[in-house]
Amino acid sequence: MRIREYTKNDLPFMTALWGNAFGDAEVLVRRFYELLPEMGTAFVAECNGVPVGMANVLCAVVCGQRCGYVYAVAVKPEVRGKGAGTALMKHCRRMFSRLCTLPASEGLYSWYADCLGADKVSCCIYETIAAGASDVEIKNLLSAEYAAMRSEYKLNTAFPLAWYEYQRELCRYYGGGMFRSGRSIACGYLEDGVLKIKECLGPTDFIPELCRRLGAEKAEIRTAFHAGKPFIAASFPLPETLNMCIALD
C-alpha cells in the first residue's frame, strides 16, 4: 500500500469515491476540491498503482496552535478491511503532529483513537427551538462577513476563509446559509424540515423567525458543552470550552 499526496489527476477518482461513499451532490464535491488548495491537502492510497482510498486534511487553529482536520476519509468497497484506511490515517499522523476529526458515527471514535491516537474528545449538546413569527431583522451573510463577525467572539478555534466559503455553499445548497441578526450569527442547513444550526453565537431570539422564513418546523442548535455528546476527537488535549461547532460534517 502506497500513500502519497493528491494531484489534479486524482480529482475524478476522489470526486467519484466521495459521491459513492457519502452521497453528497457532485457540485458540492467539485467545489470542495476547487477550494482545497486554500484549505489544506489530501492523500491518496494506492494498491499496485491503482488509487483505492483518500483522506482530506484541512488546516485549523485550535487554542492558538495549528492542527490538521481529517475530513471525508473513504476507501473503495472492494478494499475495505484490508488496511487502506488505517494506512491513510497513519500517514496523516506522520505528516501532522496535531490532528482532529469529527467521526461519522459513534463506532469510529475507537478506530480514530487506535490509528490516530485521537483519544481526546470534546462534546456538545443540541437544543430545539420551534418556528415562530416576529419582526426581528435577519440578514444573509457572505462567508467573509461571517468569518469577520465570528472573530469578534474571540473563540478558541479559527479556520481559513475558504473553509467558511465551503460551509456557506453547502448550507445554501440545502436551503440554509449564514445569517446575522444584530450581533448574533448562525450557520445552518435544512434536513427533513429541521433547520440544523451548526453554530449560533449570541442571543437566539431570532431563530424562530429564521425557521419560519426558511420553511422549517423547528431548529436544532449545536452548542459546545463539556458534559454533552461526543463530538470532535483529537490527538491532543482539548479545553472544555472548545467551540468547533462549525466543523465540516
Residue ranges and their predicted role:
Residues D119-K198:
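Amide-forming acyltransferase catalytic core, primarily the GNAT-like/NAT-type
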Residues L11, W18-A60, E152-G177:
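Active-site rim helix/loop that mediates acceptor-substrate recognition in acyltransferases
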Residues M1-I3:
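Extreme N-terminal starter segment of soluble prokaryotic enzymes
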Residues V44, V50-C59, C67-Y69, A74, ...:
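Conserved beta-strand in the GNAT
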Residues P37, F43-A45, P51-V52, L58, ...:
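Core nucleotidyl-transferase/polymerase catalytic module
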Residues E78-H91, D205-C211:
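Conserved acetyl-CoA pyrophosphate-binding loop and the N-cap/start of the following alpha-helix
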